[in-house]
Curated annotation (Swiss-Prot):
The modification Phosphothreonine is found at residues 8, 108, 134, 137. This is Hemoglobin subunit alpha. The modification N6-acetyllysine is found at residue 16. The modification Phosphoserine is found at residues 3, 35, 49, 102, 124, 138. Pfam families: Globin. The gene is HBA. Involved in oxygen transport from the lung to the various peripheral tissues. O2 binds at residue 58. Keywords: Acetylation, Heme, Iron, Metal-binding, Oxygen transport, Phosphoprotein, Transport. Heme b binds at residue 87. The modification Phosphotyrosine is found at residue 24. GO terms for molecular function: haptoglobin binding; heme binding; iron ion binding; organic acid binding; oxygen binding; oxygen carrier activity; peroxidase activity. The modification N6-succinyllysine is found at residues 7, 11, 16, 40.
Amino acid sequence: VLSPADKTNVKSTWDKIGGHAGEYGGEALERTFVSFPTTKTYFPHFDLSHGSAQVKAHGKKVADALTNAVAHMDDLPGALSALSDLHAYKLRVDPVNFKLLSHCLLVTLACHHPAEFTPAVHASLDKFFSAVSTVLTSKYR
């Protein structure tokens, strides 16, 4: 459960990210593919090379979904319901992949905003990404 301090940390960090969210989403997705090659199996139709426009575009979709989740932190299940359905019923993404991407998102944010990436912010973002992952995998049961 996200505390009020966690919510403040997440919103503040996301505000600082601003217009870079899509760029960071693409970078985190590429980092996921490089670090965890099995994640590539869900994207056989993508050009997965460094700097791929398809990876960047999908990374922007990820970032947009997270931006929506930040705006609706008090109702993540409602905000992410359609995305949860898509990943559970149509795409059938292995739930572990959300954790892997979350890790790569944390690394990407830490690389771009080291001064703001305090232990408290790290913990809050980790809890937030975990909450998002939990919602996205809730329909698997």
